[in-house]
Curated annotation (Swiss-Prot):
Gene that specifies this protein: clpX
Binding locations of ATP: 113-120
Name used for this protein in its record: ATP-dependent Clp protease ATP-binding subunit ClpX
Protein source organism: Francisella tularensis subsp. tularensis (strain SCHU S4 / Schu 4)
ClpX-type ZB domain span: 1-48
UniProtKB keywords: ATP-binding, Chaperone, Metal-binding, Nucleotide-binding, Zinc
UniProt key word Nuclease: no
Family under the similarity heading: Belongs to the ClpX chaperone family.
Positions with a binding annotation for Zn(2+): 7, 10, 29, 32
SUPFAM superfamilies in the record: Glucocorticoid receptor-like (DNA-binding domain), P-loop containing nucleoside triphosphate hydrolases
Length: 417
């Protein structure tokens, strides 16, 4: 006589239910399987609700937060604050489905020179909103089937940063850097394949607009019979950034064409515009002439320009933000019970050096690391040094920093080596 099976969860026998599945240490009936599935589904939905936008910061609050970490770029801050607020407001609106009006998402295009803060903007916004964040380099992307990263691998990175919580990843932010580097070479469509240019732009279209993307859990190429994770990109905010070097000529050419005939005074005015003011005049047709396809431009409706950072901006970046570089080095030296001090003129010379190298804010850390290398190497082994002073001669003439001992004597670095 066959042994009667009982469900380990509800206790019902196999005669009382449709089916019972046996495992190594227990059994489960079809009714309990349904209840478990429902429980998992409801738990999954709460995971999506973990990112609650009921207390979403208002644009003014978002800008205030950006002010704490980013110097200058006021117009870009306002544009991004409104864009981010509207994006996440749109998500909650679409969830409620009060009416048939569906709000389309507005992805962002940031245009600005190297080191102007494009990546920092995206990182800071993700930190404020506590959403997963991923960075991709457009120059490494290729169309599916070619050597390089598939565009869908961007989603894999976001998933990894969300600890593979799909619901959280679907509310995240993706920053695609160097989008200008995948511009097609000419306005006319090429009959040859352009796997790292127009082809990548085409591949990005659906992803940025919103699609259900099937991605391999560990990235890489897709293979037959491979388990895939389904990720809906409809609510992911895409921020694309690029320097668009040389686009000023495209803008100027368009403006000069408009200002012909009797408008010679207007032409003169256009010619005298500096680079920053000229960039503020950018329009969609300029981006098309530069090499972005119109369809991609249409999916990046919010365009904002970041100005090139001036000397005074870089000095402020060194000292003012919450995580300013100088504050970071002060903290590092404190671990060795040493104070470090930078003179005002030293900060100016560091800023000038970054401008000369055309690296913007991005190059400030490299300059400081080079200046402080020997000090950071030897100071931990010297117990009597209390203070390090960096003046302009250390930056300009590569002189050794001034070292002060606990007895207020001054030493040179060579004295403690």
């Amino acid at each position: 006589m066959a042994k009667i099976l009982y469900c380990s969860f509800c206790g019902k026998s196999q005669q009382e239910v449709k089916n019972i599945i046996s495992g190594r240490d227990g059994n489960i009936c079809n009714e309990c399987v349904s209840k478990c599935a429902e429980k998992i589904r409801s738990t999954g939905s709460t995971s999506a609700e973990d990112i609650s936008f009921e207390k979403l910061p208002k644009p003014v609050e978002i800008k205030k937060y950006l002010d704490d970490y980013i110097i200058g770029q006021d117009n870009a801050k306002k544009v991004l604050s409104v864009a981010v607020y509207n994006h996440y407001k749109r998500i909650t609106s679409n969830l409620t489905k009060d009416d048939d009006t569906e709000l389309k998402k507005s992805n962002v295009l940031l245009i600005g020179p190297t080191g102007s803060g494009k990546t920092l903007f995206a990182q800071t916004l993700a930190k404020l909103l506590n959403v997963p964040f991923a960075i991709a380099d457009a120059t490494t992307l290729t169309e599916a089937g070619y050597v390089g990263d598939d565009v869908e691998n961007i989603i894999v990175r976001l998933l990894q940063n969300a600890d593979f919580d799909v619901a959280k990843a679907q509310k995240g932010i993706i920053y695609i850097d160097e989008i200008d580097k995948i511009a097609r070479k000419s306005e006319s469509t090429s009959i040859t394949r352009d796997v790292s240019g127009e082809g990548v732009q085409q591949a990005l279209l659906k992803l940025i607009e919103g699609t259900v993307s099937s991605v391999p859990p560990k990235g890489g190429r897709k293979h037959p019979n491979q388990d895939m994770i389904q990720v809906d990109t409809s609510d992911i905010l895409f921020i694309c950034g690029g320097a668009f070097a040389g686009i000023e000529k495209v803008i100027k050419h368009r403006m000069d064409k408009v200002s012909i005939g009797f408008n010679s005074d207007v032409i003169q005015q256009k010619n005298s515009l500096d680079s920053d003011k000229l960039m503020q005049k950018i329009e969609s047709e300029d981006l098309t002439r530069f090499g972005l396809i119109p369809e991609l431009i249409g999916r990046l409706p919010i365009v904002t320009v970041l100005n090139e950072l001036k000397e005074e901006d870089l000095v402020r970046i060194l000292t003012e933000p919450k995580n300013a570089l100088i504050k970071q080095y002060i903290k590092l030296f404190k671990f060795d019970n040493v104070n470090i001090e930078f003179t005002d003129q030293a900060l100016v010379e560091i800023a000038k050096k970054a401008i000369t190298k055309k690296t913007g804010a991005r190059g400030l850390r490299t300059i400081l690391e080079n200046v402080l290398l020997e000090v950071m190497f030897h100071i931990p082994s010297s117990e009597d040094i209390e203070k390090v002073i960096i003046n302009d001669k250390v930056i300009l003439e590569q002189q050794e920093p001034i070292l002060a001992t606990k007895t207020q004597q001054q030493k040179q670095l060579k004295d403690i080596i």
